[in-house]
């Protein structure tokens, strides 16, 4: 009888550990040709925050316990990024290189991997049309939001009117995310920039304000 409290404690601890693992998200991977053993993790959903990931000969494991759907990007040299979508109980594996990754996972991760490989397989002049088609077919996807940011909001020469049209067509939970708010702020900034450039052009000035 004396062993019952001990066995009960062990059982409770085991159950707690099992439940914890079911709520964990694990990112595993091995990336080739990394210029640093440190990868910056930039959280975009549900809120902005930063973390770091240390690699050992390109290999890494990163585990979190997300309360809700989470999105973050792996950043190397402040340039190349790999978006990752995290949810409870999921595992994602990344291989390849930082600029040509292979993402093994479910849901948004699978969707992201498919569009990454689709874009890599076509000429650069066909990428805008492919991106637009994907976004129009997946208006409630965080992958679409990422593509809008990468190929439109970060590109000064992108079609601003198309950016506005595609953004307005998005719906679902992504509309209320901080990432969407950030994208909308970029659109306002880009709109003001385009407006100022048009005024300067009409006045006979170049983009640097010189006549």
Model-derived segments and their meaning:
Residues 140-153:
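Amphipathic alpha-helical repeat scaffolds of TPR domains
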Residues 137-141, 173-181:
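Short solvent-exposed coil/turn linkers within tandem alpha-helical repeat scaffolds
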Residues 1-17:
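Sec-dependent bacterial lipoprotein signal peptides
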Residues 181-211:
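N-terminal "domain-start" segment that seeds a small globular fold
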Residues 122-128, 157-164:
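Helix-turn-helix repeat elements of alpha-solenoid scaffolds
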Residues 33, 125, 155-158, 174, ...:
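Alpha-helix capping and inter-helical loop/turn segments
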Residues 19-138:
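A non-transmembrane, solvent-exposed segment enriched in polar/low-complexity residues
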Residues 131, 160-170, 198-202:
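Alpha-helical repeat scaffolds
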């Amino acid at each position: 009888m004396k062993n019952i409290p001990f066995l009960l404690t062990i059982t409770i601890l085991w159950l707690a550990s099992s439940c914890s693992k079911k709520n964990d998200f694990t990112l595993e991977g091995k990336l080739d040709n990394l210029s640093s053993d440190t990868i910056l993790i930039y959280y975009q959903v549900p809120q902005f925050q930063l973390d770091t990931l240390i690699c050992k000969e390109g290999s890494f494991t990163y585990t979190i316990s997300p309360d809700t759907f989470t999105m973050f990007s792996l950043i190397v040299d402040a340039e190349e990024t790999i978006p990752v979508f995290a949810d409870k109980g999921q595992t994602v594996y990344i291989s390849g290189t930082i600029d040509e990754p292979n993402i093994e996972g479910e849901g948004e991760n699978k969707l992201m991997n498919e569009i990454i490989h689709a874009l890599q397989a076509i000429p650069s002049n066909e990428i805008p049309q492919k991106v637009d088609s994907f976004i129009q077919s997946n208006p409630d996807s965080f992958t679409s939001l990422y593509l809008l940011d990468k190929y439109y909001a970060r590109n000064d020469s992108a079609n601003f009117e198309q950016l506005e049209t595609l953004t307005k067509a998005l719906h679902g939970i992504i509309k209320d995310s901080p990432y969407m708010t950030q994208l909308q702020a970029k659109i306002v900034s880009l709109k003001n920039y385009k407006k100022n450039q048009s005024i300067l052009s009409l006045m006979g000035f170049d983009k640097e304000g010189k006549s």
